[in-house]
Amino acid sequence: MPEPLTPSAQKVQDALAAQGFSYQVVESPTPSRTAAEAARLVGCQVAQIAKSLVFRMKQSGRPVLVIASGANQVNEWRIGALLKEPLEKAPAAFVREHTGFAIGGVAPLGHPKPLDTFIDQDLLKLQEIWAAAGTPNALFRLVPGDLAKMTGGRVVKVT
C-alpha cells in the first residue's frame, strides 16, 4: 500500500479530483527545489518541468502566477506589459499567503483564491509535463493542454 501523502500534497490531489482530473500526485523522499533536480527525479527533460513562479504586481500588489517550462527564464517585463503593470519577484511569505504553498512546491492549482495565471506556450509543444504538487518532494504528471483548464490561465510567450 502506498504511503499517505503529506497534507500539502494531499491538498493538490484533492484539488485535482475536485476538478475531475485523475492525475496522481507522487512524493519522493528526495526534494527537488529546481527544475533540473525535478527532471532528474522523474527522468524527464528539464523543459518538461512546469515551474510555478509567483510575482507581485508593483502598484496593486496582486499576485500573478506564471507557469513556465523549466528550460525557460520568465521575462517579467513581457508579463507586466500584458497586465499593464510592472511585476516584481514575490517574497516567500507573499507566495505562501496567496498560494498556500512554500516556494519550491507551488502547484498550479489548489490555491486559496484563483490567481491571474499565464502559461508558457512552449509547454504546449510537449506530450507530457510534470508540475509541483504542494511540496518540493511532490509532483504530478499531466497533459499540457490541461493546464489552462485547471488554472484558467492564458497561454502566452513568457521568454
Q: How would you name each of these model-derived features?
A:
Residues 1-159:
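Extended, low-hydrophobicity, polar/charged segments
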